[in-house]
Curated annotation (Swiss-Prot):
<feature type="binding site">
    <location>
        <position position="137"/>
    </location>
    <ligand>
        <name>ATP</name>
    </ligand>
</feature>
<feature type="coiled-coil region">
    <location>
        <begin position="181"/>
        <end position="240"/>
    </location>
</feature>
<feature type="domain" description="Zinc-hook">
    <location>
        <begin position="391"/>
        <end position="489"/>
    </location>
</feature>
<dbReference type="InterPro" id="IPR013134">
    <property type="entry name" value="Zn_hook_RAD50"/>
</dbReference>
<keyword id="KW-0175">Coiled coil</keyword>
<feature type="binding site">
    <location>
        <position position="437"/>
    </location>
    <ligand>
        <name>Zn(2+)</name>
    </ligand>
</feature>
<dbReference type="GO" id="GO:0005524">
    <property type="term" value="F:ATP binding"/>
</dbReference>
<keyword id="KW-0547">Nucleotide-binding</keyword>
<comment type="subunit">
    <text>Homodimer. Forms a heterotetramer composed of two Mre11 subunits and two Rad50 subunits. Interacts with Mre11 and HerA.</text>
</comment>
<comment type="function">
    <text>Part of the Rad50/Mre11 complex, which is involved in the early steps of DNA double-strand break (DSB) repair. The complex may facilitate opening of the processed DNA ends to aid in the recruitment of HerA and NurA. Rad50 controls the balance between DNA end bridging and DNA resection via ATP-dependent structural rearrangements of the Rad50/Mre11 complex.</text>
</comment>
<keyword id="KW-0067">ATP-binding</keyword>
<feature type="binding site">
    <location>
        <begin position="32"/>
        <end position="38"/>
    </location>
    <ligand>
        <name>ATP</name>
    </ligand>
</feature>
<dbReference type="InterPro" id="IPR038729">
    <property type="entry name" value="Rad50/SbcC_AAA"/>
</dbReference>
<keyword id="KW-0479">Metal-binding</keyword>
<feature type="coiled-coil region">
    <location>
        <begin position="320"/>
        <end position="416"/>
    </location>
</feature>
<dbReference type="GO" id="GO:0008270">
    <property type="term" value="F:zinc ion binding"/>
</dbReference>
<dbReference type="InterPro" id="IPR027417">
    <property type="entry name" value="P-loop_NTPase"/>
</dbReference>
Length: 886
């Protein structure tokens, strides 16, 4: 197996990394924690869904912050290229595919199926790979300590021990076969019972066959009897069909005869009624002509009455209009005066409007003047000068206090400074190391120090006295200032109040002055408009005198001479129409003597005739109906006679049939009884046949069972032979020499492989020997034939033999072994041993075609021909490929 490529997506620290292995020795190099070993974990995960990490769940392999991860690995074996896709966490999406001629052929899906397929293709599992060609960090030589357990696991010796145990699978299988032989004894008993049961069933079948023959004979007799009655019944049934048809036809004819007889019952009465109303109906047309004449005559009378009413209205209207025209002429002089007054009034309306507005404004101003005077009388003039002077005096005193306080505070600060300086001198007297006074320069003895202390105390008392006096003056001034500040605030509030009152007083005086000026202006304007106002009032008086004449004139103003002429012409036309209608009236009276002279009598006559017409129209409807019925009844009479003849003919045909309803029902009962008997016989026959078939089936089934039981009985000799062979196998496995034989075979093969490998390394050994006795020790032989334990070898030699042993085991167990993976092999190695390891790795390339080396050691780059650099950027591993020329 050669690994060609791996892709890691959201796997451990890799976000999306693709690594191609193109060299014989591929060196993956980078700092610790860069993500190098994650690539080896990816190879293991891709092949076996496992890693070298101690994790709880595969989901922990997903890159932090991501929801899913994926590993894809491409490898070659026997000339074929395979692609494995693994999903971290989700097993159902795992696949293995064969890449052939540009096509992807899926070989297996889901995690377990894919694992089995990979094991089938590679020929080995995870345990073998981890024990041989995948070497973890710093564990090159661990093969020496793990060798006994590895060999025992690889050779499955523990499985052989399990086989020969008393509760092992061989013992269990012998027990199963023995139980099977015991069960065959019970089968013999079952076989005898089954054969006896078959004999019993055969006897019952013979009895059933005899019973079946008897019942079939009885069924034949009843069937023949039923056929005889059916023949007679079918003949009578055919006659009955004809009888039923004729009876049905006779029933229809009888019904029709009854219906026609019922309808012909009142024929004579209807004929009499028809003849009676025939003469009355003839009056209908005569009365309709009278109604037409009355309607025309009535129209003439209505028009005459209407014209007379119109003439009366026109005459009255003409009289009224003539009177109104006369009054209109009488009022024309008054109307003329009114129009002249109105014209002048309109000319003066603008002036009058101005006068009223000014007068209204003047009234408002006079009221305001009076109100302002009253309010001013209530207010007294306020003088604020005395308050302003007082505030100024207080403010001046506050300023004086502020200036004095400033001087006092400065003086207090100066005194406090002097006091601190004096205290400092007093306190430092004891610490003076020089024997001279720092103030006067005289020799400084204890007496001089005491004197200085007394002088300082006097100065301090004086200073405290001055400071206290100053503080008392400061406190007094501050108190005075606070009182003055309070006084000034009160005075300022009073000043604000008086200033406000003064402002109100002065504002009202100013407003009164403005109102007086406006009053004078308005009075002058009124004087200029007074003459117009007086003229306007005079015109208004005259208007009142003429308004009634004006309104009366307006009422009569719509009457004109032309209107009266039109009205007179209209009156003449109406009189002319009235004359024409009166002529028509006289003509109608002369021609139709039945017409009354007045409209009321005419209306009464019209109502009587219309009522008679309504009665006659109803009679005519009845007349027409009776006429149709009489015509129809004459046809019914003829139909009645024909139906009576048809009735006689049907009665004769029914009599000729000779049908007997009594015999028909008798035959029906006999046939029904025989059919039921025959059905019962058939049911019994069906039961007997069913029982017969069931017993035959039972016999067939039991015969099959007997055949199977006999076949099982034949197994007894085979089972005994199987038990014998298993017992012999168990005896062979119990032989202690078997394990030794197997171990020797494997030891020889591994020894040959190890010696073949180390021959390619530049070592001073002639051979390696493996001793499986006890702890499975390893020894080497020098060129001189000396036997040396591996623990006595140098570090480089031990590494060489460890690699050789791993490769030898892999070669013995794996046909397709061709890749060696070393993860941080230089851990715990000194510089010399690291160099030796490089030489060993270079030599190993002659044995294994592909080596993948993971390291942080820059020296190991010398061993590689294809360099893969890994570095961590943030939380993500990045890969860069570079070649290296040795």
């Amino acid at each position: 197996m050669i690994i060609r490529e791996i892709r890691l997506q959201n796997f451990l620290s890799h976000e999306d990394t693709t690594v191609k292995f193109e060299g014989s020795i591929n060196v993956i190099i980078g700092n610790n924690g860069a993500g190098k070993s994650s690539i080896i974990d990816g190879i293991l995960f891709g092949l076996f869904k496992r890693t070298n990490r101690d994790i709880g769940k595969n989901e922990e392999l997903i890159k932090k912050g991501k929801k899913s991860g994926q590993v894809s690995i491409k490898f070659e074996i026997n000339g074929d290229t395979y692609l494995i896709d693994r999903n971290v966490g989700e097993t159902s999406r795992d696949t293995i595919s064969l890449l052939k001629e540009g096509k992807i052929i899926t070989l297996a899906r889901q995690s377990t199926t894919v694992n089995n397929k990979i094991k089938e293709i590679l020929g080995f599992d995870h345990k073998i790979l981890m024990s041989t060609t995948i070497i973890g960090q710093g564990s090159v030589e661990s093969v020496f300590s793990d060798f006994p357990e590895v060999m025992k696991e690889l050779l499955k010796i523990n499985k052989l021990e399990m086989l020969r145990e008393s509760n092992g699978p061989i013992h269990s299988l012998i027990k199963v076969l023995t139980d099977r032989i015991r069960s065959l004894q019970s089968i013999k008993d079952i076989l005898k019972r089954e054969e006896a049961e078959i004999d019993r069933l055969k006897k019952e079948i013979e009895e059933i066959k005899v019973k079946l023959e008897n019942i079939e004979r009885e069924a034949k007799e009843k069937e023949d009897e039923l056929n005889q009655y059916n023949t007679e019944f079918n003949r009578i049934k055919e006659i009955k069909v004809q009888y039923d048809i004729l009876s049905g036809e006779l029933s229809v004819v009888n019904k029709k005869i009854e219906e026609i007889a019922l309808r012909l019952k009142d024929f004579e009465e209807k004929e009499k009624r028809y003849n009676k109303i025939e003469t009355e109906v003839k009056e209908l047309d005569e009365n309709r002509e009278k109604i037409n004449t009355i309607s025309s005559f009535k129209s003439i009378l209505v028009q005459i009455d209407s014209l007379k009413s119109q003439i009366n209205v026109v005459e009255n209207d003409l009289k009224r209009k003539k009177e109104k025209l006369k009054r209109k002429k009488e009022l024309e002089e008054k109307e003329k005066q009114y129009e002249e007054i109105e014209k002048r009034k309109k000319e003066l309306e603008e002036k009058e409007k101005q006068y009223e507005e000014i007068e209204k404004r003047l009234t408002y101003v006079l009221k305001n003047i009076e109100r302002q005077k009253n309010e001013i009388e209530k207010l007294n003039y306020v003088d604020t000068q005395d308050l302003e002077n007082k505030i100024k005096d207080v403010s001046d005193r506050i300023n004086q206090i502020d200036n004095e306080l400033k001087g006092l505070l400065d003086r207090r600060g100066d005194l406090n400074g002097r006091k601190e300086q004096t205290l400092k001198i007093y306190n430092n007297l004891n610490s003076i190391e020089d024997d001279r006074c720092p103030i006067c320069g005289r020799p400084l003895d204890s007496e001089h120090k005491a004197k200085i202390r007394e002088e300082i105390k006097v100065q301090l008392l004086e200073l405290n006295k001055q400071i206290t006096a100053l503080q008392a003056r400061i406190n007094s001034l501050i108190k005075e200032r606070e009182e003055l500040e309070a006084t000034r605030n009160k005075l300022q509030l009073e000043l604000q109040k008086r200033s406000k009152e003064k402002g109100i007083y002065e504002a009202k005086l100013k407003e009164l002055q403005r109102l007086e000026e406006e009053k004078n202006k308005l009075q002058n304007e009124i004087l200029s408009l007074l003459s117009y106002h007086q003229e306007f009032e005079n015109i208004a008086e005259k208007e009142k005198e003429l308004i009634d004449y004006h309104e009366e004139y307006l009422k009569n103003s719509d009457i004109l001479e032309e209107d009266i002429q039109e009205q007179e012409q209209r009156l003449n036309e109406l009189n002319s129409k009235l004359s024409e209608l009166e002529k028509s009236y006289n003509d109608y009276k002369a021609k139709y003597q039945f017409l009354p002279a007045d409209l009321k009598s005419l209306v009464s006559l019209e109502e009587r005739i219309r009522r008679r017409i309504s009665e006659l129209e109803k009679l005519k409807i009845e007349y027409e109906r009776l006429k149709e019925e009489i015509t129809r009844m004459k046809g019914l009479k003829e139909e009645y006679e024909k139906l009576k003849e048809e009735e006689d003919a049907l009665l004769n045909r029914i009599s000729e049939l000779g049908y007997s309803e009594k015999r028909y029902k008798q035959l029906e009962e006999i046939i029904d009884k025989l059919s039921k008997i025959l059905s019962g016989i058939e049911a019994d026959k069906g039961k007997i046949k069913g029982s017969l078939e069931e017993k035959i089936k039972n016999i067939e089934e039991k015969e099959r069972n007997i055949e199977e039981l006999r076949n099982k009985m034949n197994e007894e000799s085979k089972l005994n032979l199987g038990i014998s062979k298993l017992q012999k196998l168990r005896e062979v496995l119990d032989n202690k020499h078997l394990q030794s034989h197997i171990m020797n075979i494997v030891r020889n093969q591994i020894e040959n492989n190890v010696n073949e490998v180390i021959a390619k390394f530049d070592l001073s050994f002639s051979a390696v020997e493996i001793d499986f006795v006890g702890k499975s020790e390893l020894y080497v032989y020098t060129a001189s034939g000396q036997k040396i334990h591996i623990n006595a070898l140098s570090g480089g030699e031990r590494i060489s033999i460890a690699l050789a042993l791993r490769l030898a085991i892999a070669k013995a167990l794996m046909n397709q072994f061709s890749t060696l993976i070393l993860d941080e092999p230089t851990v715990n190695l000194d510089e010399y041993r690291r160099k030796e390891l490089i030489d060993v790795i270079r030599s190993a390339i002659e044995i294994v075609p592909q080596i993948i080396l993971v390291t942080h050691d820059q020296e190991l780059i010398q061993a590689g021909d294809y360099i893969i650099r890994v570095e961590k950027k943030g939380d993500t591993s990045k890969v860069e490929v570079s070649s290296y020329d040795r």
